[in-house]
């Protein structure tokens, strides 16, 4: 049966259901017509399949091989390695019954502070596109689909679900869409995932220009577009704009909205049919349910975790970058070597959030080093917090004096970078910097191995002899680090991002993470090395930088240009005495350009392996896009006629060969800005663009950056937004406790900061039916000071009472100081007391009711009101200081220290002895009749309480009368 024929047999309700998930990971099915579901799963550097379909959490996932995260994979600059990795992941997916893996993530690294940079490839769109394409080809070669993400301009975690990226079209096309375009055209991914954020005021999930005009009409994408989890705001608008599938399930909420929109004439059913067709085509590709295409017979997938771990180790070696080496590496196993830092024994191998993998095995660098030699160890500092421990530091420095060489394992703790929030600074923990400085003061041979997902500042860089950037290297990172330290393998990775000296040096320093409503991309095209070269800024380590244990020479450049294309040939020789791999990079620059441009841009690269003394000729082809820029006025890519320079080098700052060529073509530009109109982009600093200049570039006025203080809270606002209202400031804590405490979304967002920035509509949609629309409406009404008493009663009827439920506590607090008129009336009235002293069956119930009556009276008094207000202020302060997180961390650390010291076993043994002693004591008490005496005393106390309660009741009644 043809898919369009099937669509004709579907009811409107079935169509609406098919364009939404069935649960967290599966598409919907229609048994009546034999339409099955397919399964998707998180990635992208390992399979993260949940064992529980209802869970969005990191726990309870299948064991899988954890490869280096995106930052490290990009440092390989190796298309073949990415393709191989994709193939491995594809086989693992097939073995586990997964049809689509959610990756790769190719968002551009606009700022080193983005909390999710560890998952992204590069600051350069060409490199990201090339590596992403190889990854996609590898996965899909195994009969498994990918979901290319996050489309588009999702370059920060702060307010990622609501912020609008204000960005000019040329920058959007050249920097932020370019990698997606390359992958769509060259690798043809089965699906693409839209991002949470808005672009110039429109949610990506509702952006018809982005999803239809650009993606499908211009690029020729014929796959399925799915939402990021919870990224849907207005489902009918999304259907019309080209969003085919909403994930995860909204438990029928979105489906009903789509049905209503079609019936009301607000959504043409043809758009729904298009979305359904895209869903069914994808399902058919992986199930063959129509019997029209069938599914090619596949060999049973082999999930060989041992073999895959070995590949993870090989890829991790290539993913690490030797930033500095003054002859101390590789290590000699005869040396007296000291490892310092907890990461040596407990490596940080991956980032936090939806990409977190349940690893098959982890071998630390300390364990792996035992295969080479005996290594001494000093903890030096904690790897999981920034707390200086003088005793640990003193021990490490003393041991460093006695060693021949010291290797310090440092980097960023988990809490410093994760999905859901951005970093606040580029600093490493001060406890680590202090120990590094202390050791370099007494030990001339010091190596630093870094475990981090994004650039860090290194105030000690000049004082150490070697720096190895290990990134987040996956489960085999410890072995890979040791392989490189001891020369078993030769470092070959190179940076896919610039390491600036300081945060203030970065191009978007003044515009990251932006304002409440918007983030302005005022730096335009000048991201990463494009900016640093534009302004002539010194950097710590340049884009493309990476050292080897050998040296390479470049020679004999020859460029053959043909119309708007060119072929670049040159030779590379291994001039050292060990085998190694070099990454040759080709950059293009335009001389005397009439449009503003970067000094040069990466347009080609090749990784080549050479034996000692071996020489190879490299050939790299440059297509028309290598010489083009995007013209918003012309609505297309244009090539400027004139002279260009081809640069060949070992990094963006280490250019070895140059050749000038001329391209003869027609100048097709319709309208270009002059240097007078955009001085910062032509001759000044793009980091200091005025509002007026940015508006000229945009062609329109800048949108509002914040809401007015008196604007009401809506379902599209966040908990953080609610704080701007009169009552929201006071109720933020209780409302936060209500929603986060009920865990309506599982653990998909792993931190409180991220949760507070999720809009109410996403919380509702992702609750999988555990929150109802009218429940959320009631909360919003409370925040807006509307129908307070009615909403509290309504929420109470939903079972959200004071007994053990956060919302009940919220309602109780609201009643004490909300609607002052009602409170005053109740105080004046003094009525309703008798309802608490009705017929009671026993003295205990009477006492309980009277106690609640007293509390009610207190709540109506100024005393309780002030106490509640003070309590809320204290609660807010605790929230601001993240006291609970710190307390949790302290408890965890105490537990870990107890475990390390063997206290658990000692306590268990002591507990056993106490238990034995307790039994003996109880036996003695029984023999002496003590238990009976205690029981009798208890009865007497109970009788006394009954009498007291009765007397208390009489006093209350008398006072009321």
What are these regions (language model features)?
Residues 1-75, 80-90, 94-96, 102, ...:
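N-terminal hydrophobic targeting/anchoring segments and the immediately downstream early-domain regions
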């Amino acid at each position: 049966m043809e898919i369009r024929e099937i669509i004709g047999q579907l009811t409107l309700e079935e169509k609406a259901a098919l364009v939404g998930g069935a649960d967290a990971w599966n598409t919907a099915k229609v048994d009546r017509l034999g339409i099955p579901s397919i399964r998707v799963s998180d990635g992208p550097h390992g399979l993260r399949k949940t064992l529980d379909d209802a869970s969005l959490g990191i726990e309870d996932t299948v064991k899988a091989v954890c490869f280096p995260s995106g930052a490290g994979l990009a440092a390989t600059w190796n298309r073949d390695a990415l393709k191989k990795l994709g193939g491995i992941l594809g086989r693992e997916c097939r073995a586990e019954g997964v049809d689509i893996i959610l990756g790769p993530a190719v968002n551009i690294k606009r700022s080193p502070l983005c909390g999710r940079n560890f998952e992204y490839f590069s600051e350069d769109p060409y490199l990201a596109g090339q590596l992403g394409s190889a990854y996609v080809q590898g996965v899909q070669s195994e009969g498994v689909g990918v979901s290319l993400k996050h489309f588009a301009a999702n370059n920060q975690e702060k307010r990622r679900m609501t912020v609008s990226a204000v960005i000019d079209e040329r920058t959007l096309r050249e920097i932020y869409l370019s990698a997606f375009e390359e992958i769509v055209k060259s690798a043809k991914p089965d699906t693409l995932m839209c991002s949470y954020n808005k672009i110039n005021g429109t949610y990506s999930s509702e952006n018809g220009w982005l999803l239809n005009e650009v993606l499908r009409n211009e690029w020729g994408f014929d796959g399925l577009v799915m939402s990021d989890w919870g990224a849907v705001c207005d489902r009918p608008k999304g259907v019309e704009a080209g969003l085919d599938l909403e994930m995860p399930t909204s438990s029928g909420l979105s489906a009903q909205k789509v049905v209503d929109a079609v019936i009301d004439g607000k959504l043409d059913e043809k758009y729904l049919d298009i979305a359904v067709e895209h869903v069914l085509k994808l399902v058919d590709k992986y199930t063959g349910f129509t019997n029209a295409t069938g599914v090619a017979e596949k060999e049973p997938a082999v999930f060989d975790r041992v073999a895959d771990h070995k590949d993870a180790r090989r890829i991790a070696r290539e993913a690490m970058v030797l930033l500095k080496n003054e002859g101390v590496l590789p290590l000699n196993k005869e040396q007296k070597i000291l490892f310092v830092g907890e990461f040596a024994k407990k490596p940080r191998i991956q980032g936090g959030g939806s990409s977190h993998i349940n690893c098959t095995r982890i071998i630390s660098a300390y364990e792996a080093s035992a295969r080479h030699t005996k290594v001494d160890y000093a903890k030096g500092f904690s790897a999981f917090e920034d707390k200086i421990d003088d005793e640990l530091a003193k021990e490490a420095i003393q041991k460093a004096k006695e060693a021949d060489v010291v290797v310090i394992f440092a980097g960023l703790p988990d809490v410093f970078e994760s999905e859901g929030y951005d970093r606040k600074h580029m600093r490493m923990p001060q406890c680590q910097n202090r120990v590094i400085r202390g050791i370099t003061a007494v030990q001339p041979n010091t190596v630093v191995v870094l475990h981090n997902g994004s650039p860090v500042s290194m105030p000690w860089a000049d004082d150490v002899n070697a720096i190895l950037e290990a990134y987040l290297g996956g489960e085999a990172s410890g072995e890979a680090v040791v392989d490189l330290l001891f020369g078993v393998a030769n470092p070959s990775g190179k940076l896919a991002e610039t390491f600036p000296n300081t945060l203030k040096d970065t191009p978007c320093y003044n515009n990251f993470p932006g304002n409440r409503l918007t983030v302005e991309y005022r730096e335009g095209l000048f991201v990463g090395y494009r900016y640093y070269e534009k302004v002539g800024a010194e950097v710590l380590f340049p884009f493309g930088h990476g050292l080897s244990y050998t040296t390479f020479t470049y020679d004999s450049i020859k460029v053959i240009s043909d119309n708007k294309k060119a072929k670049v040939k040159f030779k590379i020789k291994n001039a050292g005495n060990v085998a190694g791999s070099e990454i040759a990079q080709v950059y293009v620059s335009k001389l005397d350009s009439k449009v503003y441009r970067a000094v040069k841009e990466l347009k080609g690269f090749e990784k080549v392996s050479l034996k000692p003394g071996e020489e190879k000729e490299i050939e790299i082809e440059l297509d028309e896009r290598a010489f083009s820029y995007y013209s918003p006025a012309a609505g297309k890519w244009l090539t400027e006629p004139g002279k260009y320079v081809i640069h060949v080098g070992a990094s963006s700052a280490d250019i070895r060969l140059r050749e000038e060529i001329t391209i003869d073509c027609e100048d097709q530009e319709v309208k270009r800005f002059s240097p007078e109109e955009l001085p910062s982009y032509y001759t000044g600093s793009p980091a200091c663009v005025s509002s007026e200049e940015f508006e000229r570039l945009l062609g329109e006025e800048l949108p509002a950056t914040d809401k007015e203080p008196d604007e009401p809270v809506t379902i599209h606002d966040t908990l953080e937004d609610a704080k701007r209202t009169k009552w929201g400031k006071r109720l933020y804590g209780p409302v936060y406790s209500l929603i986060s405490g009920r865990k309506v979304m599982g653990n998909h967002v792993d931190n409180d900061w991220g949760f507070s920035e999720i809009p109410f509509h996403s919380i509702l949609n992702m609750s999988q039916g555990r929150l109802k629309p009218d429940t959320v409406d009631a909360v919003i009404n409370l925040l807006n000071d509307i129908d307070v008493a009615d909403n509290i009663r309504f929420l109470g009827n939903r079972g959200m009472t004071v007994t053990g439920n956060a919302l009940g506590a919220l309602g109780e607090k609201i009643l004490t100081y909300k609607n002052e008129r009602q409170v005053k009336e109740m105080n004046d009235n003094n009525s309703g007391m008798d309802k608490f002293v009705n017929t009671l069956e026993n003295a205990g119930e009477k006492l309980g009711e009277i106690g609640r009556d007293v509390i009610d009276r207190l709540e109506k008094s100024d005393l309780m009101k002030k106490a509640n207000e003070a309590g809320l202020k204290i609660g807010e302060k605790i929230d601001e200081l993240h006291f609970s997180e710190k307390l949790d961390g302290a408890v965890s650390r105490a537990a870990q220290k107890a475990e390390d010291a063997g206290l658990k076993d000692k306590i268990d043994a002591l507990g056993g002895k106490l238990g034995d002693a307790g039994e003996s004591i109880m036996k003695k008490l029984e023999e002496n009749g003590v238990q009976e005496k205690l029981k009798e005393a208890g009865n007497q106390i109970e009788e006394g309480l009954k009498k007291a309660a009765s007397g208390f009741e009489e006093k209350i009644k008398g006072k009321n009368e």
